[in-house]
Amino acid sequence: MTGMRDQTQKVPPDAEIIARQWALTQTTITDICSTNIATRLPRNANLPFLVMFRAGGNLMNPRSDAHIQNALLPMECYAGRWGGSGNDKPFADYSTATSLANAVIQAAFNYSNGYITTSDSNTRAKIYSFEIVQFPTRIEEVSTGLGRYSIALAMTYRAV
C-alpha cells in the first residue's frame, strides 16, 4: 500500500522514565545524589537532588519508518540545606550543585548506543546519544534558599 508506514514500529516510552533510569545507572551521577532523581523536587527532600522533565522534542526524521525521537530534557541540580523554624537557616551549596550538573553532562557526553530497562515496569528503550543543549547555569533560588544549577540535554532514543 502506498503511503503506509511500518506498523510494527513502537512509539518510544516516556522520555522522563527512560532518562531517570539512565541517570540511575550512571555512577558519576549517583555518587553525588544517590537515587535522589525525580521529575519534581519534593519539599524537604534529601539533597543533593536531580530534577528532570520532558519539555518537548521532535521526530528525528518525520519521513522515516523508524520512530526515533529527540526529547528535550531540562534538568535542575539542587544542593544545600532546607531552612526550618527558628535559627535553622537554609544553606545554598553551589559547589555540590555544580558538581552534580557537571557529572550529568560528563555522563551524557560519554554515553552512546546503550539499552535501558526500567526495573519496575520492564520498559525498554535504546538511547543513541545525548546532546548537551545548555551547560550549567547558576540560578538564584529565592524560594528554597538552596544551591541550584540548570542544565539541559536532548536525548535521541527509540523503543525496543
Give each language-model segment a name.
Residues M1-C33, F53-V160:
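Charged, amphipathic alpha-helical segments and their flanking helix caps
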Residues T35-N46:
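Short acidic low-complexity segments
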Residues A45-A55:
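Charged, often glycine-rich, active-site loop that binds/positions anionic groups
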